[in-house]
Amino acid sequence: MAKILVLYYSMYGHIETMAHAVAEGAKKVDGAEVIIKRVPETMPPEIFAKAGGKTQNAPVATPQELADYDAIIFGTPTRFGNMSGQMRTFLDQTGGLWASGALYGKLGSVFSSTGTGGGQEQTITSTWTTLAHHGMVIVPIGYAAQELFDVSHVRGGTPYGATTIAGGDGSRQPSQEELSIARYQGEYVAGLAVKLNG
């Protein structure tokens, strides 16, 4: 049995929705145990609520538990072309895992959300830097998801990982195509994890 963690941060719910689609795809793979968790919120509750943050039911992960998984699929919104501060704060607490090599050889993949032109690909590839320092095997999705070839309308999705275009005010929710790419990413990573660890 390969253990897959879908680990995310979501302020307004876009990445939360994508995380559930990633997990749905991963659960299609026989021999994959899939768990969804989120990183802790770093904003004071009153500021989070005032900013319109969405309450989420996923349990909160601890940095130490990352070593328990065979694959980790990280989801983060874009903040100035990088991962969110909450995800950065969480990953900055993994120094002990780095020192012991606890994540070495584990699969790592990333999905993201952003406004149009907000840096979705840069967010994914800059997150890969942290995964590389841990010795994780980085898993992009390439162009195997056919939705990536549809240019008839605005949508997220890259060869690096699933994305959604949230729009400047956050009103645009993930489209069915974007969710399909996210499901593909989950299924693809889980399939590799089972082959390597199942």
UniProtKB/Swiss-Prot annotation:
Q: Where does NAD(+) bind?
A: 12
Recorded source organism is Salmonella paratyphi B (strain ATCC BAA-1250 / SPB7)
Q: Which UniProt keywords apply?
A: Flavoprotein, FMN, NAD, NADP, Nucleotide-binding, Oxidoreductase
Stated name of the protein: NAD(P)H dehydrogenase (quinone)
List the catalytic activities from the record.
a quinone + NADH + H(+) = a quinol + NAD(+); a quinone + NADPH + H(+) = a quinol + NADP(+)
Give a Gene Ontology cellular component term annotated to this protein.
membrane
Give the disulfide map.
none
Q: How is the cofactor bound?
A: Binds 1 FMN per monomer.
Q: Which PROSITE patterns match?
A: FLAVODOXIN_LIKE
Q: What class of enzyme is it?
A: oxidoreductase
The family database entries (NCBIfam families) matched by this protein are listed as:
flav_wrbA, PRK03767.1
Q: What's an example of a GO molecular-function annotation for this chain?
A: NADH:ubiquinone reductase (non-electrogenic) activity
Q: What is its EC number?
A: 1.6.5.2
